[in-house]
Amino acid sequence: MFRYLVYSWIFSSSLSLCEIPLAAAVIAYYSFDEALGNETVYGVDASEEALWASDMARGPGVQPSLGSGTFSARQWSRSGLDMEDYFSFTLAPLPGFELTIDQIQWNERRSSSGVRQWLWRCSLDDYTLNIGGVHTIPDNDLTRHQTLPLPSDTFTRLDEAITFRLYGYMAESSQGTWRIDDLRLEGTVSAVPEPSGIHATIALLVLFSILKRNRAPQSNFETTSTFQDEMSV
């Protein structure tokens, strides 16, 4: 009976060591439904309980502009990338939690003389590398839906704040506008797992010891039984 109790404990301990990944969901959402477009900052509509999400903001190089139901700006760079021309927001998991971000989805629209290129960067490398490359916007004023998949080797199990910046440049006029809408982040926010490596090692050692101990007596018993049978013939 004791052996079966130990096996049961080892099995249940092994299950507790397994991490079952959660399905990705919307963890933060900026709708801008009630926005005029020219607010200095605009708050998040919803976010996971264990996740803090900042207001949406602009870089110091651009100016607010009107755009009902969006978050808009003008004075974008008319040439190459300007590190002060961007939209930005920050995410931070609460203590004891970690953040995985799978992708960003949003809508964007330029005026007829707005930006022609955009890219994302983040604070993990001090805004040095592009995330997903440089993207060119068609020369029209249509609303487009964009999706940016994030590499799992960089944006998995983050336990500190991260700031994203969406840069726009190559505007056809300094008065040309560019606006974003309906921005959502998909991923998971989960509790930091307890350190479990030592528990797994102990469980395996106990199992090995039990199996070895039980196998040895069984072998001796079979040998003795066979010997006694031969003697009785």
PLM features: what roles do these ranges have?
Residues 116-126:
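Short, surface-exposed beta-strand/strand-loop-strand elements in extracellular ectodomains
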Residues 95, 108-117:
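Extended, low-complexity, turn-rich repeat/linker tracts enriched in Gly/Pro/Ser/Thr and Asp/Glu
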Residues 94-103:
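Extended extracellular/luminal ectodomain segments enriched in beta-structured repeat modules
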Residues 209-233:
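C-terminal membrane-anchoring or membrane-association module
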Residues 194-212:
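A short, hydrophobic C-terminal helix/tail in secreted or cell-surface proteins
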Residues 56-92:
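Surface-exposed, low-complexity/disordered Ser/Thr/Gly/Pro/Asn-rich loops and linkers
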Residues 133-191:
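Terminal, low-complexity interaction segments
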Residues 21-40:
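Boundary/junction segments of secreted and surface-exposed precursor proteins
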